[in-house]
């Protein structure tokens, strides 16, 4: 059966970290937040964040506060799963690369990643975010992330990629009439 429950996904990511820790040539592993969270919850958070003003983290906090109590509880579990995986990477000295997602769910992924960096990247680099370079807004995001790291005193980790969703994103932008 191909579908895994989020807690099973978390446990599998932790097993990957445990294995990587025994292999000198595997210094990191990748995580997709969509393995921990309902896509529609990420979409809702992203939409709420886009309707708010301010920094990424201010918009994130506003969005989380705007969720129903049930959704807040669900999101709390997502954060806990991510924190457990990141904690395992920290304990085993294995980097955790948070993969990029589609633009319409990326903001909560970025916010969650910043939260994890703020916890785990104080004295060493453990958590990395992913920047899809085809996106027109990512240079500003990189600068804002650097500013957050300076202000909160954590080490900023970034993986730069072309972007796996480039064609899909371009088609969606053309259909919906926004800049790709």
PLM features per residue range, with description:
Residues 1-180:
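Positively charged, amphipathic and often flexible ligand-engagement surfaces
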């Amino acid at each position: 059966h191909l579908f895994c429950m989020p807690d099973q996904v978390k446990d599998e990511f932790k097993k990957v970290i445990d294995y990587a820790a025994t292999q000198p040539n595997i210094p990191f592993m990748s995580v997709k937040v969509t393995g921990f969270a309902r896509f529609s919850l990420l979409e809702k958070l992203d939409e709420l964040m886009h309707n708010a003003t301010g920094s990424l983290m201010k918009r994130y906090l506003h969005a989380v506060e705007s969720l129903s109590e049930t959704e807040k509880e669900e999101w709390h579990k997502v954060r806990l799963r991510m924190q457990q995986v990141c904690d395992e990477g920290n304990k085993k000295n294995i980097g955790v690369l948070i993969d990029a997602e589609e633009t319409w769910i990326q903001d909560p992924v970025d916010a969650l990643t910043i939260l994890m960096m703020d916890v785990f990247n104080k004295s060493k680099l453990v958590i990395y975010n992913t920047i899809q370079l085809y996106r027109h807004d990512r240079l500003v995001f990189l600068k804002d992330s650097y500013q957050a790291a300076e202000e909160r005193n954590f080490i900023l980790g970034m993986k730069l990629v072309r972007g796996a969703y480039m064609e899909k994103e371009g088609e969606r932008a053309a259909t919906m009439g926004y800049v790709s």
